[in-house]
A protein has these predicted regions:
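Short, acidic/charged, Gly/Pro-enriched secondary-structure junctions
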Residues: 89-116, 133
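Helix-start/capping segments and mature chain N-termini
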Residues: 1-94, 119-304
Length: 304
């Protein structure tokens, strides 16, 4: 995979022009024949939820946890996915084998259909699709070694009583796109977002950790943003190494006190951060070690 100005060469093939199959409403359908009507409620009113999963050596990492969150997101958005979690797990495993994806990405998505076009849409059909494709690093592999650069976004994560914050609902990513575009325009790779109280929250699609001078880790309390599956995994790895992890409110003024920083996420995996605005960080052995342990874990199990 090659990178150029934050674009992946593999992404130059438009996603609607690819070949193979997509699992769509219970059937394997030709990639080019999967269509969504322009008057779908999910498109106009963001009644849509999704997941993002990684395939390592032919096996989906923590598939059950991702599927469980997929169903939780749908329920929080007021609709039921018309399949069981076991059905979705089986379909996900089936599609990666059909597409011969060995190391890639899986995208389940569910949305309200086009039967109604209004704020209220309780009689709409719920559509479900699962697509997969070969995919390498989310960030430039060179930057995964040197560390990526973040600005601080002007957009903030909304207060938890204003949105279904503990979901992967499509509408929640609007400010993430705005923030990342602004960061890229100004020469950064990604953006750090604050919460509604002005404390550190997360990057546009990943959780964040900091290392202090004593070797302890600090990460924001996920009370207005996702408690990521990768975040929880890395905390478990850190504790197994007797690294103390403090989950707490972190003020941006504390950035100058930390010596290391990294992001975690299904796409980002474990990615070091070299700077946030004017605050610089070292890619230290602790971060390198956590990344190595994470890579060993995700590639531990092979597909049967």
């Amino acid at each position: 995979m090659f990178f150029s100005n934050n674009f992946y060469i593999s992404d130059m093939i438009p996603y609607d022009k690819r070949s193979g199959k997509i699992w769509y409403n219970g059937e394997l359908v030709d990639w080019s024949n999967v269509k969504v009507h322009v008057l779908s409620h999910g498109l106009h009113y963001a009644s849509c939820v999704f997941e993002g999963e990684r395939v390592y050596d032919g096996s989906i990492f923590k598939l059950e946890e991702h599927t469980s969150r997929f169903f939780h997101s749908a329920r929080r958005m007021g609709f039921e996915i018309p399949y069981s979690e076991a059905d979705i797990n089986a379909a996900s495993n089936s599609i990666i084998k059909n597409q011969k994806v060995d190391n890639g990405y899986v995208r389940p998505v569910a949305w309200r259909g086009s039967e109604m076009m209004a704020i209220s849409a309780q009689q709409t059909k719920i559509h479900v699709a699962i697509a997969t494709w070969e995919w390498g690093s989310y960030f430039d592999p060179k930057l995964k070694v040197e560390g990526i650069r973040l600005n601080i976004s002007n957009w903030r994560r909304p207060a938890p009583n204003t949105i279904p914050w503990d979901t992967k609902a499509s509408g929640l990513y609007m400010i993430c796109t705005l923030s990342k575009h602004e960061a890229e325009k100004n020469g950064y790779t990604d953006s750090l977002m604050l919460d509604h109280e002005g404390n550190i929250a997360e990057a546009t699609g990943a959780n964040i950790f900091f290392k202090d001078k004593s070797g302890d880790l600090h990460t924001p309390v996920p009370d207005s943003f996702l408690d990521g599956i990768t975040r929880r995994t890395v905390i478990e790895i850190a504790k197994s190494k007797n690294i103390k992890v403090h989950e707490r409110k972190i003020n941006p003024n504390e950035l100058k006190n930390f010596i290391g920083c990294f992001l975690t996420g299904t796409a980002a995996e474990v990615t070091p951060v070299s700077c946030i605005a004017e605050n610089e960080f070292k890619v230290c052995d602790l971060i390198i070690g956590l990344n190595e342990s994470y890579q060993q874990l995700v590639r531990k199990k092979k597909a049967a």
